[in-house]
């Protein structure tokens, strides 16, 4: 028995892994992929926006009372934008709408797809390597 393998049943010789098998390795990868795909779909839906008009229309009064002459009137930001206002300190970035067809958004989507594919290839290689090492361990 000095040269034989001790069978203690605690799976201490399995490269530090527990005896749970492949489930502990595969399942977090799938959960991560599902969460990432849900996040990307949600981001794409939010970025595409809605084409319906605002729920509360902005009305312009024909005559302005004297009490509101020097006050700032807040609008919903649906009118045309002046590009020079973008560099103004008082500019609010949420007035400028997102475009899904812009170069930056397309570049981000391509990067996300590349990272998802790379993660899938990595997980496939890692799980296959763990599967073959577990299968060949008994022989």
UniProtKB/Swiss-Prot annotation:
Record topological domains on the Virion surface side: 1-100
Residue ranges of the TM segments: 101-121
Name the membrane topology term: Single-pass type I membrane protein
Gene Ontology CC entries for this record: host cell Golgi apparatus; host cell membrane; membrane; viral envelope; virion membrane
**Can you say where in the cell this protein is located?**
Virion membrane; Host membrane; Host Golgi apparatus, Host trans-Golgi network
Under the subunit heading, UniProt states:
Interacts (via N-terminus) with gM (via N-terminus). The gM-gN heterodimer forms the gCII complex.
Main location class: virion
This molecule's function is given as: Envelope glycoprotein necessary for proper maturation of gM and modulation of its membrane fusion activity. Also plays a critical role in virion morphogenesis.
Which family, according to the similarity comment?
Belongs to the herpesviridae glycoprotein N family.
Which InterPro entries does this one have? Herpes_glycoprotein_N_domain (IPR005211), HSV_GN (IPR034707)
What UniProt keywords are attached to this protein's entry?
Disulfide bond, Host Golgi apparatus, Host membrane, Membrane, Transmembrane, Transmembrane helix, Viral envelope protein, Virion
- Name of the protein described by the UniProt record: Envelope glycoprotein N
Ranges per topology, Intravirion: 122-139
Does the record's keyword annotation contain Cell cycle?
A: no
Q: Which organism is it from?
A: Murid herpesvirus 1 (strain Smith)
């Amino acid at each position: 028995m000095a040269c034989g393998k001790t069978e203690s049943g605690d799976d201490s010789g399995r490269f530090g892994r527990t005896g749970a098998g492949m489930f502990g390795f595969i399942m977090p990868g799938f959960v991560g992929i599902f969460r990432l795909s849900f996040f990307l779909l949600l981001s794409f839906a939010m970025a595409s926006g809605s084409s319906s008009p605002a729920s509360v229309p902005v009305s312009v009064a024909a005559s302005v009372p004297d009490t509101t002459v020097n006050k700032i009137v807040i609008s919903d930001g649906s009118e045309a934008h002046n590009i020079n206002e973008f560099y103004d300190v008082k500019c609010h970035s949420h007035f400028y709408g997102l475009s899904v067809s812009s170069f930056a958004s397309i570049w981000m989507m391509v990067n996300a797809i590349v990272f998802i594919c790379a993660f899938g290839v990595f997980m496939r290689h890692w799980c296959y390597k763990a599967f073959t090492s577990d299968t060949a361990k008994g022989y």
